[in-house]
Amino acid sequence: MARYTGPLCKLCRREGMKLYLKGERCYTDKCAFDRRPYAPGQHGQRRTKLTQYGIQLRAKQTVKRIYGILERQFERYVEKAMQKAGDTRENLIQILEARLDNVVYRMGFAINRRQARQLVNHGHFLVNGKKVNIPSYLLRPNDVVEVREKSRDLEVIKKAIEANKERSIVPWIEVDYDNYRGTFLRYPSLEEVTDLPVDLQTVIEFYSR
C-alpha cells in the first residue's frame, strides 16, 4: 500500500499546527514547526482565508496525518462510523483509537505512530498471544497487546519505554512495562481524546456533502 515517506515536519507546517509526528523531537528546540510555523513552499508565509470547504478539507487531512491513514481507508472508517448508531464523531474516534498501531503508540512501545506502524509490520507484537502484523487491525475491549519475547531486546522499543514510562497513560489503556504488555481496556469517549486538535464534526461534514 502507498504510504507518505516525505519529511514529517512539512505535514505539521502544512496544517499550521504541531501534529507530534516525530515523538520526542517535537518537544525540543529542533522542531521545524517552531522555527518555521508557516506552510512549506515559496508562498508559504502568505495568509489565505479558507472557505468552509477548505476548513473541512484541512480538518480531514489533519486527522489522517495524525493517525497515518490514507484516504481510501479513512473514508471507509467514516462510512462505518456513519452507519453505526450513536454519535458519529465518537464512533469514528473509537475506530481510530482501536487501531493496533495507535494502541502500540499509546502504550508507549513506540515514540510515534509511524514507528509503531513499522514495528507492527515487522511482527514484533502479539495480540492475545498471537502474532499480528497488520497496523490497521482493530482491537476489542480487554485485548492484550504484548511485545514478542525475541523483540524485547530491540533498542528502539527499550528507548521508547524509557522515554514514555514516566508519562501518564490514557485511561482506556493499562500498561505493564516490566512484562512488556498492555491491555486495551475499552473504547474511549470523544471527550477523553484530548490531543486531537480538530473538531471531528467538521470532518464528518466534509464526507456528508
Swiss-Prot record:
SMART domains: Ribosomal_S4, S4
GO molecular function, one term: rRNA binding
Cofactors that this protein relies on: Zn(2+)
Record InterPro entries: Ribosomal_uS4 (IPR022801), Ribosomal_uS4_bac-type (IPR005709), Ribosomal_uS4_N (IPR001912), S4_RNA-bd (IPR002942), S4_RNA-bd_sf (IPR036986)
Domain (S4 RNA-binding) ranges: 98-161
C4-type zinc finger locations on the chain: 9-31
Name of one Pfam family that matches: S4
Top-rank taxon, per record: Bacteria
GO cellular component term of the entry, any: small ribosomal subunit
Name of protein: Small ribosomal subunit protein uS4
